[in-house]
């Protein structure tokens, strides 16, 4: 089971890299993304909340032929919120971190699927 493997890896201090702007399951969290409602995956925030693993959004861009990874500020688990709201709050922060990276290097961000809810067809 994929989720169990991810949880085990994180609880043992391992690293897990996930795409944070691709709601492949189409059951993600609705966030504000560049001023419009968009769907982002709940997985990164949910895993961090369940395991207390640090969550760092990473954005990438190119400088010439070199790929540059930028580790954004850590997203803290908001313990003061109920569990369901924690994931939504953290996912909104992930979206905000991606907005910063995309604003700085829009030419290096590529949408592989519809992210904004207004662009998606019927579920």
In which residue ranges do the predicted regions lie?
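Non-catalytic C-terminal accessory region of glycerolipid acyltransferases
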Residues: 2-123
